């Protein structure tokens, strides 16, 4: 059924499609379904939390049109906030590690946002520190995606129920999501555990920065995952297991899915699909594995992920 016209672009956030992977999954493995979050108007899963955090602040009287928002971001949350701010009449300033892709930087600027780069060696901690400095100096409002309860709550209210409705009572045996802020995993995981008591919730993190597994933080190339610390927005009780994914493994899988499935996915999506394939092999035929593809590969055309010699 075609969607009826809406009054605001923010009204078309959510209700993203789910697609079965057919060519990268072994015949004797579980079925794998991916939720295409890059179909949101701002191009990623982070559109959901961007709108949720802004609307929460509006309800609480913390912001009004014309005010300035500041936020540390590895890219997609900033892009989501930038487009929401543009639509609602707010100014936006973002701090982000200098290691993030050129497309992400350009997208932020295209929406009229100001961008402040921080040292890549400091990862997200450096961006968070700089955002707090700007907030204190100028009195900006900071949504704080790593602390804001609206982050996991919006996934509990929308993403999780969408999956339950999309699978129409069918069993979901495992749900996997990469952990950046942990909002998606926490919110969706809570919903699915109520609906499917035997579902396995799996956290995905960078092999090079295995903080959730008890390891040390470190630099990695899985943009949007592995902040280098355990965020307040992550419910560490919701997941049952952790799968670590390497830089090259995630990139190779993202490229393969583009070639073999026609799905142009980002780096963290490559990590999600690789982890889903491992879980599908473990569970075996007849089971159902679901994961989220956070962003589109077009955001990585200037990076080694999709750089071609000719």
Swiss-Prot record:
The Enzyme Commission number assigned here is: 2.5.1.47
N6-(pyridoxal phosphate)lysine occurs at: 46
Q: Where is the signal peptide?
A: none
Task: Quote the pathway field.
Answer: Amino-acid biosynthesis; L-cysteine biosynthesis; L-cysteine from L-serine: step 2/2
The answer to whether the entry has keyword Amino-acid biosynthesis is yes
Enumerate the UniProt keywords alphabetically: Amino-acid biosynthesis, Cysteine biosynthesis, Pyridoxal phosphate, Transferase
GO molecular function list: cysteine synthase activity
Root EC class: transferase
Catalyzed chemical reaction(s) = O-acetyl-L-serine + hydrogen sulfide = L-cysteine + acetate
Q: Which GO terms describe its biological process?
A: cysteine biosynthetic process from serine
Cited InterPro entries: Cys_synth, Cys_Synth/Cystath_Beta-Synth, CysK, P-phosphate_BS, TrpB-like_PALP, TrpB-like_PALP_sf
This protein's cofactor list reads: pyridoxal 5'-phosphate
- Which Gene3D superfamilies does the entry mention? 3.40.50.1100
Protein residues bound to pyridoxal 5'-phosphate? 76, 180-184, 268
Task: Summarize the subunit comment.
Answer: Homodimer.
Which family does the record claim for this protein?
Belongs to the cysteine synthase/cystathionine beta-synthase family.
Can you say what this protein is called?
Cysteine synthase
Q: Which organism is it from?
A: Staphylococcus epidermidis (strain ATCC 35984 / DSM 28319 / BCRC 17069 / CCUG 31568 / BM 3577 / RP62A)
Q: What is the lineage of its organism?
A: Bacteria, Bacillati, Bacillota, Bacilli, Bacillales
Name of the gene: cysK
């Amino acid at each position: 059924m075609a969607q009826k016209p809406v009054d605001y672009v923010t009204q078309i956030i959510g209700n993203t499609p789910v697609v079965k992977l057919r060519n990268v999954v072994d015949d004797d493995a579980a079925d794998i379904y991916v939720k295409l979050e890059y179909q949101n108007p701002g191009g990623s899963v982070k559109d959901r939390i961007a709108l949720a955090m802004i609307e929460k602040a509006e309800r609480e009287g913390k912001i009004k049109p014309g005010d300035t928002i500041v936020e540390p971001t590895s890219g997609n949350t900033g892009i989501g906030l930038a487009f929401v701010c543009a639509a609602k009449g707010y100014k936006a300033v973002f701090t982000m590690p200098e290691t993030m892709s050129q497309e992400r930087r350009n997208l932020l600027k295209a929406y009229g946002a100001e961008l402040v780069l921080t040292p890549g060696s400091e990862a997200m901690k450096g961006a968070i520190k700089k955002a707090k400095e700007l907030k204190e100096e100028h009195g900006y409002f900071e949504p704080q995606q790593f602390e804001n309860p609206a982050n996991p709550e919006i996934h509990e209210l929308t993403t999780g129920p969408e999956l339950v409705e999309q699978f129409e009572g069918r069993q979901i045996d495992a749900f996997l999501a990469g952990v950046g802020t942990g909002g998606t995993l926490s919110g969706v995981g809570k919903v699915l555990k109520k609906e499917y008591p035997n579902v396995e919730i799996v956290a995905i993190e960078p092999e090079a920065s295995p903080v959730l597994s008890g390891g040390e933080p470190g630099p990695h190339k899985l943009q949007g995952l592995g902040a280098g610390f355990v965020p307040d927005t992550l419910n560490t009780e919701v997941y049952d297991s952790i799968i670590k994914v390497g830089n090259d493994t995630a990139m190779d899988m993202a490229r393969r899915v583009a070639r073999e499935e026609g799905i142009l996915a980002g780096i963290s999506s490559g990590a999600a699909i690789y982890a889903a394939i491992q879980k599908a092999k473990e569970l075996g035929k007849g089971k159902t594995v679901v994961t989220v593809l956070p962003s589109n590969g077009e955001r990585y055309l200037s990076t080694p992920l999709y750089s071609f010699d000719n």
